[in-house]
């Protein structure tokens, strides 16, 4: 049974709505909005605002605390205090912010820290950020070849380092050096300071992508490609606004460390990797990237094997009851049910009808692998082996670690076609 050391009435949950109107709000976020005693929100489009108001009638719009010439930091302090005050009254409060509620958001972090320090239950739920949208719309993978993310003014003030071998993402490029707020937009008159730094690091002809995520479902994102020098042109500079983000692709690819490749045994003895990583698809925004064919001999061989594919012996398809599927969905989307389960696993599991004995036992235990075994109808001996020998069980066939992605960098080292 899992119990909480925090017994104070009142809680704070911070959620995000994503960037694109309504559609990027998670089911988890929506469930907390619906269950809250009071909701405070700060969103950027009226459709999302209207949607929130249909899900909970006890809502407060935090956007009203901005004002022309008013310090944004003062506004953020006020926003956080408004939420914490209601938590202190014993209410279950939800704070809603656009995008990811913890990415380039000040009041969410402040309110959470204060609530936690005073002994209240407080947590943040993830959301879709502008950077997530950027990765999707520009079709880039932050893991290849790595990514640095900065706020533009901080990037300049603290002389943050740049790696010309990695992606660079700069937020708030439309309000460089501006600490206050204006309903009509920002006079970005220090923008040239940012351009100077980019030219210093990358040169005048290096590409920069001006990115704005789509905020409405009928819109397309802005993905305009310029050179650093073109950013100095007034007609282009004035397109950069408060919701603009810059993506700067790598200037060059870093050479592989041959000694490390040998130590990791990524290549057969005597085989030497390419000087430049060759990965398909290539980054369309990056200059001088080697072309790679989509159907190399190794790809064709892998595709040919599909004709003879059969699920391996260790693969376990889903084999769960409707009762178990329904209760796991309820735990994911019903905050009250989740609280009841966390308070007493056994009592909750006993109250659920139509579970199989293995499913009920797993739910009582609350162990994620026990639940996986029950829903996949896997032998309980696998779970027992894992408990007895820990990591050793994974070497004997227990799926202790699930790998759902392949790092392209390793693949590029191993391919010499």
UniProtKB/Swiss-Prot annotation:
Residues 379-399 are annotated as: Precursor leader. InterPro entries: 4pyrrol_Mease, 4pyrrol_Methylase_sf, 4pyrrole_Mease_sub1. Keywords: Methylation, Methyltransferase, S-adenosyl-L-methionine, Transferase, Virulence. Omphalotins display strong and selective activity against the plant-pathogenic nematode Meloidogyne incognita but shows no further phytotoxic, antibacterial, or antifungal activities. Its EC number is 2.1.1.-. GO terms for biological process: methylation. Changing residue 76 to F: Impairs methylation activity. Residues 1-251 are annotated as: Methyltransferase domain. The modification N-methylglycine is found at residues 405, 408, 411. S-adenosyl-L-methionine binds at residues 98, 100, 103, 130, 172, 213, 244-245. The modification N-methylisoleucine is found at residues 407, 410. The modification N-methylvaline is found at residues 401, 403-404, 406, 413. Pathway: Mycotoxin biosynthesis. In the N-terminal section; belongs to the precorrin methyltransferase family. Homodimer. This is Methyltransferase/ribosomally synthesized cyclic peptide omphalotin A precursor ophMA.
């Amino acid at each position: 049974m899992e119990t909480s050391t925090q017994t104070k009435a009142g809680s704070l949950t911070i959620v995000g709505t994503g960037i694109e109107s309504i559609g990027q709000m998670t089911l988890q976020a929506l469930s907390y909005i619906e269950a809250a005693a009071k909701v405070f929100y700060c969103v950027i489009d009226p459709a999302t605002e209207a949607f929130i108001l249909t899900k909970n009638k006890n809502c407060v719009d935090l956007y009203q605390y901005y004002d022309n010439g008013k310090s944004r930091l003062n506004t953020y302090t006020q926003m956080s205090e408004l939420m914490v005050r209601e938590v202190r009254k014993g209410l279950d409060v939800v704070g809603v912010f656009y995008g990811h509620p913890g990415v380039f958001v000040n009041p969410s972090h402040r309110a959470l820290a204060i609530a936690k320090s005073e002994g209240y239950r407080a947590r943040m739920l993830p959301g879709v950020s502008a950077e997530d949208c950027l990765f999707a719309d520009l079709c880039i993978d932050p893991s290849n070849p790595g990514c640095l993310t900065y706020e533009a003014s901080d990037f300049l003030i603290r002389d943050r380092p740049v790696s010309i071998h990695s992606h660079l993402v700069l937020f708030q490029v439309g309000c460089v050096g501006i600490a206050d707020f204006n309903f009509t937009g920002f006079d970005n008159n220090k923008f040239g300071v940012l351009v100077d730094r980019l030219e210093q690091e990358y040169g005048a002809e290096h590409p920069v992508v001006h990115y704005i995520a789509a905020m409405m479902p009928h819109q397309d994102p802005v993905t305009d490609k310029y050179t650093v020098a073109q950013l100095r042109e007034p007609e282009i500079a004035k397109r950069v606004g408060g919701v603009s983000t810059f993506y700067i692709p790598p200037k060059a690819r870093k050479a592989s460390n041959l000694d490390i490749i040998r130590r990791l045994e990524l290549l057969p003895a005597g085989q030497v990797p390419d000087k430049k990583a060759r990965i398909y698809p290539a980054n369309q925004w990056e200059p001088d990237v080697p072309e790679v064919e989509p159907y190399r001999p190794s790809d064709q061989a892998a595709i040919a094997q599909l004709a003879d594919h059969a699920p391996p012996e260790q693969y376990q398809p889903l084999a769960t009851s409707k009762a178990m599927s329904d209760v796991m969905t309820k735990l994911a989307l019903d905050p009250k049910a989740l609280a009841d389960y966390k308070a007493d696993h056994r009592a909750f599991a006993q109250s659920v009808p139509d579970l199989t004995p293995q499913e009920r036992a797993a739910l009582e235990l609350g162990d994620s692998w026990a639940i996986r075994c029950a829903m996949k109808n896997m032998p309980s001996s696998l779970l027992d082996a894992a408990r007895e020998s820990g990591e050793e069980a994974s070497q004997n066939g227990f799926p202790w670690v699930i790998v759902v992605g392949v790092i392209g960098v390793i693949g590029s080292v191993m391919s010499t076609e």
